Amino acid sequence: METIAKHRHARSSAQKVRLVADLVRGKKVSQALDILTYTNKKAAVLVKKVLESAIANAEHNDGADIDDLKVTKIFVDEGPSMKRIMPRAKGRADRILKRTSHITVVVSDR
């Protein structure tokens, strides 16, 4: 049984979160949680929260056994970017893009 958890509008760029997502794709959830716990990146905290949510969803909604679960799919899509203005010298201004991402984790017991 596949179970999904999503975090939409996560305040980190998709490029940075994908680096962490690639570390846990295809792993057992216990091993994935260990990897994320000791990965020293902000994105690891975001991905870990979504993975824990997916595990809880599988246990509560589908009655799955946690020991059998694997991360079957994990993907990160770009979310909307917030545009901000950075004042510069001589009356000019630059646009700053504060990027967001949508993190999706699918766990399965197969």
From Swiss-Prot:
One of its GO terms (molecular function) is rRNA binding. InterPro entries: Ribosomal_uL22, Ribosomal_uL22_bac/chlpt-type, Ribosomal_uL22_bac/org-type, Ribosomal_uL22_CS, Ribosomal_uL22_sf. The keyword Ribosomal protein applies. PROSITE patterns: RIBOSOMAL_L22 (PS00464). Keywords: Ribonucleoprotein, Ribosomal protein, RNA-binding, rRNA-binding. GO terms for biological process: translation. It holds the Pfam family Ribosomal_L22. One of its GO terms (cellular component) is cytosolic large ribosomal subunit. Belongs to the universal ribosomal protein uL22 family. This protein binds specifically to 23S rRNA; its binding is stimulated by other ribosomal proteins, e.g. L4, L17, and L20. It is important during the early stages of 50S assembly. It makes multiple contacts with different domains of the 23S rRNA in the assembled 50S subunit and ribosome. The globular domain of the protein is located near the polypeptide exit tunnel on the outside of the subunit, while an extended beta-hairpin is found that lines the wall of the exit tunnel in the center of the 70S ribosome. Part of the 50S ribosomal subunit. This is Large ribosomal subunit protein uL22. The lineage of its organism: Bacteria, Pseudomonadati, Pseudomonadota, Gammaproteobacteria, Enterobacterales.
